[in-house]
Amino acid sequence: MKAVRVHILGSGGREHAIGWAFAKQGYEVHFYPGNAGTKRDGTNHPYEGEKTLKAIPEEDIVIPGSEEFLVEGVSNWRSNVFGPVKEVARLEGSKVYAKRFMKKYGIRTARFEVAETPEELREKIKKFSPPYVIKADGLARGKGVLILDSKEETIEKGSKLIIGELIKGVKGPVVIDEFLAGNELSAMAVVNGRNFVILPFVRDYKRLMDGDRGPNTGGMGSWGPVEIPSDTIKKIEELFDKTLWGVEKEGYAYRGFLYLGLMLHDGDPYILEYNVRLGDPETEVIVTLNPEGFVNAVLEGYRGGKMEPVEPRGFAVDVVLAARGYPDAPEKGKEITLPEEGLIFFAGVAEKDGKLVTNGGRVLHCMGTGETKEEARRKAYELAEKVHFEGKTYRRDIAL
């Protein structure tokens, strides 16, 4: 085992994938709280906030998987956390802060207004034409964006969002964004200060059903690497550079992962949103493409060393198996049977009486790899078909 231990905060497929990559390179891995699958690659522990962080040795590295930990301030509690401090995590934690940050530092984003009351919303919506885009200020677990054609419906739902009657636990100001047509793209990087290395580009599928139909989800699958023209990559690098320059001007140094949610509009990438952590299910594909390269990039980013590009080896496809009722009311407690072979990252899985059972919306990530996208896709779907639980739901068009 390597001298440095790795402590991963979270319980989803993304966290399992990160831990798997480190375990594969010989690191001792600990998960907080983890799930029924993560303990195959490390040790699970309860997560008790600051108390948990204080007990982790200073020489070890802590990697928060999801944004809640960073917004909570885990990087403020300890210096061995690979993630930005909570003041910088506001880039994800507050859409209003993020949009004002982009405007302040001349970073390309959609034209916007902020409305703090229903009356302001009614007045400011007049500056926009349909479709109307309304975004909740705070974290809303992927449910905080409304895209509507009717001005009256936008005012009605946007007002409910402001006063806390639309989404449970979400209230406060909203961002009105100009609608941008184009192709969405995610760009993720490992960052230390002004230095960064962009990870392989991955396409994910947000809608529940084939053909991009049905409700939005956390993501039903992904594949990579996606080929991006070099001139577009150069423009994306400029967006990362300007963002990190802005963070520095605000008096902070960025260390951790940075994710740009982009829209390619008229040949230029615009930032729709920032995330201060890796995407899920994109992470599962990135680490599978080159686990060793991913681990090295993270460790060099953590230490402030020279980060090398993570070169993809072949192709990888992730097919997500979800529970019936996802995303609104996923069924839990259904027994799972798994094949003996194949790479599967666990998400909403628990152990009950020695058996694996469903315990969340997205249950498992079935991975396929190959020299071609078609080979990787075939393997991922062959694996998905060998997994059994009542109500298994998945898309058939990932990586087509």
Swiss-Prot record:
Fetch the HAMAP family from UniProt.
GARS
Keyword list, A-Z = ATP-binding, Ligase, Magnesium, Manganese, Metal-binding, Nucleotide-binding, Purine biosynthesis
**Gene3D superfamilies per UniProt:** 3.40.50.20, ATP-grasp fold, A domain, ATP-grasp fold, B domain, Phosphoribosylglycinamide synthetase, C-terminal domain
Q: Give the protein name, as stated in the record.
A: Phosphoribosylamine--glycine ligase
Q: What is the lineage of its organism?
A: Bacteria, Thermotogati, Thermotogota, Thermotogae, Thermotogales
Q: Where does Mg(2+) bind?
A: 273, 275
Note on how the cofactor is bound: Binds 1 Mg(2+) or Mn(2+) ion per subunit.
* GO terms assigned for molecular function: ATP binding; metal ion binding; phosphoribosylamine-glycine ligase activity
Write down the Pfam families for this protein, in alphabetical order.
GARS_A, GARS_C, GARS_N
